[in-house]
């Protein structure tokens, strides 16, 4: 069954991630074209997929299409189920040393690999275009923008397409994953928000109160309908990162969309909200990594 994005009510305006991502990709293509016209190397992105998980294959296909659209050269590494951690580590070492590769993407989860963090930490931080390496997250914590985690950075871009201020607002993040919730808190702190993070140990009454107080609500848990739409503060901006497939084949988020759309000023659809922005931001990071590599190669960068 093909999922389609829900339509917002008259109360809320849709934050159309597909449209905004396309605009971002169009601008990135101009950057790549200008780079190549100036005689610089075309940005190169290594895409590593292990096994044949259908969801992972779809995500990787979307990323490869985006790379082709903007003119990034994608180097595909489709590895069989059962590929060992040692084999992946050896591949990462090769990619780290390859000057044609400016970005390395390891599609998660990695089947049969109990601790993917060891492999993430093996990636050269300058090629970590997912923004997951501890060094890059540390730079974000210090307000030193470099390669930032893609989903939070994409959400910041989405927020910039609303008519709502960010600075001085109350922001609530539900979910504290290393790849979304935690760096999202850093992004919103840097943007000037007062940030509340909720997680599995947050008492239900505190969760509800935190959601009701949020001018900006970001939910990234992966549980359909976790946040009732009736909890949404009138006039809030709702960013629903969750994507969940129901038994009837529909894709839904973590927030009750219909009720939330009656109260929010802006809301992301599921699908078609955050996901396309994550992919577009990955391309943005890859181009920035290529630009930074050129500075380092010229002798003006810090190695």
Swiss-Prot record:
Its EC number is 1.5.1.5, 3.5.4.9. It catalyses: (6R)-5,10-methylene-5,6,7,8-tetrahydrofolate + NADP(+) = (6R)-5,10-methenyltetrahydrofolate + NADPH; (6R)-5,10-methenyltetrahydrofolate + H2O = (6R)-10-formyltetrahydrofolate + H(+). The keyword ATP-binding does not apply. SUPFAM superfamilies: Aminoacid dehydrogenase-like, N-terminal domain, NAD(P)-binding Rossmann-fold domains. Keywords: Amino-acid biosynthesis, Histidine biosynthesis, Hydrolase, Methionine biosynthesis, Multifunctional enzyme, NADP, One-carbon metabolism, Oxidoreductase, Purine biosynthesis. PROSITE patterns: THF_DHG_CYH_2. NADP(+) binds at residues 175-177, 243. GO terms for molecular function: methenyltetrahydrofolate cyclohydrolase activity; methylenetetrahydrofolate dehydrogenase (NADP+) activity. GO terms for biological process: L-histidine biosynthetic process; methionine biosynthetic process; purine nucleotide biosynthetic process; tetrahydrofolate interconversion. GO terms for cellular component: cytosol. Pathway: One-carbon metabolism; tetrahydrofolate interconversion. InterPro entries: Aminoacid_DH-like_N_sf, NAD(P)-bd_dom_sf, THF_DH/CycHdrlase, THF_DH/CycHdrlase_cat_dom, THF_DH/CycHdrlase_CS, THF_DH/CycHdrlase_NAD-bd_dom. Catalyzes the oxidation of 5,10-methylenetetrahydrofolate to 5,10-methenyltetrahydrofolate and then the hydrolysis of 5,10-methenyltetrahydrofolate to 10-formyltetrahydrofolate. HAMAP family: THF_DHG_CYH. Homodimer. Belongs to the tetrahydrofolate dehydrogenase/cyclohydrolase family. This is Bifunctional protein FolD. It comes from Xanthomonas axonopodis pv. citri (strain 306). The lineage of its organism: Bacteria, Pseudomonadati, Pseudomonadota, Gammaproteobacteria, Lysobacterales. The gene is folD.
